[in-house]
Design a protein with these regions (language model features):
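A charge-rich, low-complexity, intrinsically flexible signal that marks solvent-exposed coils, linkers
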Residues: 1-150
Length: 150
């Protein structure tokens, strides 16, 4: 379960009118921090990001599932499930056996998924997949919604 301060930071982003992807970024950043601190590992930066996005959706961030063709059917279905979980609020307590199994599986993975080199490679490949217009639009919005200094 994500810490309360992460959820609070995401809520603050929402109040400031930032996109759900920015709100979800708080959870992804937190996940990277967990890997760096050695709490658990991840097979790749993509897996670490996916875990963060899943936690964000379950915490109530209104991040829509990826569009058809952008991600696998399984990923899209899981994102839909996470979103529904986030809308419904916490149901029954998660199974202890499952939680321990996932935790142990992640503990066996390496820590290099959150290294500067791996994240830089991931960021570059993600940027390459976007059009110039999309990148420009995002930069303009970032400048518009950036916190004012002072």
């Amino acid at each position: 379960m994500p810490e309360d301060e992460i959820i609070e930071r995401a809520r603050e982003d929402e109040r400031e009118g930032k996109l759900p992807s920015t709100q979800a970024g708080e959870f992804v950043r937190d996940e990277m921090e967990h890997i760096r601190e050695g709490e658990h590992g991840a097979r790749s930066p993509q897996q670490a990001i996916a875990i963060g996005l899943s936690k964000a959706r379950r915490a109530g961030v209104k991040l829509p599932p990826p569009k058809r063709g952008k991600a696998s059917t399984r990923t899209r279905k899981q994102a839909k499930r996470d979103l529904a979980k986030g809308r419904k609020g916490r149901g029954k307590k998660p199974s202890r056996k499952r939680s321990r199994a996932t935790k142990r599986a992640l503990k066996r993975e390496g820590r290099s998924a959150a290294s500067r080199k791996a994240l830089s490679r991931q960021a570059r490949s993600a940027a390459r997949r976007r059009s110039a217009a999309s990148r420009s639009r995002a930069a303009k919005k970032a400048a518009r919604t950036r916190k004012k200094r002072g």
